[in-house]
């Protein structure tokens, strides 16, 4: 089982799919990584040689921000917005949608379960 960026890749999947188990790597990024490393995308992850794993690992370390570093950057960006007090930061702080979605109805994912108000009728 190959271990890249602190993640154990699943054994029986194609390496193109297995790389997407790493936070910050999707399908297109995994295809680019494999093309630069010169590894066939259809190879199963348990059939990779040590040199291929080393090439992939080196390519990811050099070109892609993944896992902890990426999570830290995202949280620092959100914290920066909240410290600035800009509109997006206020929306993050209040736990409301940030990208202009409606909130009179819907937005339940961001707002949480509905809290009924006593005495409010149509």
From Swiss-Prot:
Alphabetized UniProt keyword annotations: Ribonucleoprotein, Ribosomal protein, RNA-binding, rRNA-binding, tRNA-binding
Region (Disordered): 96-122
GO molecular function per UniProt: rRNA binding; structural constituent of ribosome; tRNA binding
Domain of life of the native organism: Bacteria
Gene3D superfamilies named among the record's database cross-references: 1.10.8.50, 30s ribosomal protein s13, domain 2 (4.10.910.10)
GO BP annotation list: translation
InterPro entries, alphabetized: Rbsml_uS13_C, Ribosomal_uS13, Ribosomal_uS13-like_H2TH, Ribosomal_uS13_bac-type, Ribosomal_uS13_CS
PROSITE patterns attached to this UniProt entry: RIBOSOMAL_S13_1, RIBOSOMAL_S13_2
TM region positions: none
GO cellular component: cytosol; small ribosomal subunit
SUPFAM superfamilies noted in UniProt: S13-like H2TH domain
Family statement drawn from the similarity comment of this UniProt entry: Belongs to the universal ribosomal protein uS13 family.
Subunit annotation: Part of the 30S ribosomal subunit. Forms a loose heterodimer with protein S19. Forms two bridges to the 50S subunit in the 70S ribosome.
PANTHER family, A to Z: 30S RIBOSOMAL PROTEIN S13/40S RIBOSOMAL PROTEIN S18, SMALL RIBOSOMAL SUBUNIT PROTEIN US13M
Function as written in the Swiss-Prot or TrEMBL entry: Located at the top of the head of the 30S subunit, it contacts several helices of the 16S rRNA. In the 70S ribosome it contacts the 23S rRNA (bridge B1a) and protein L5 of the 50S subunit (bridge B1b), connecting the 2 subunits; these bridges are implicated in subunit movement. Contacts the tRNAs in the A and P-sites.
Record's protein name: Small ribosomal subunit protein uS13
Source organism of the structure: Geotalea daltonii (strain DSM 22248 / JCM 15807 / FRC-32) (Geobacter daltonii)
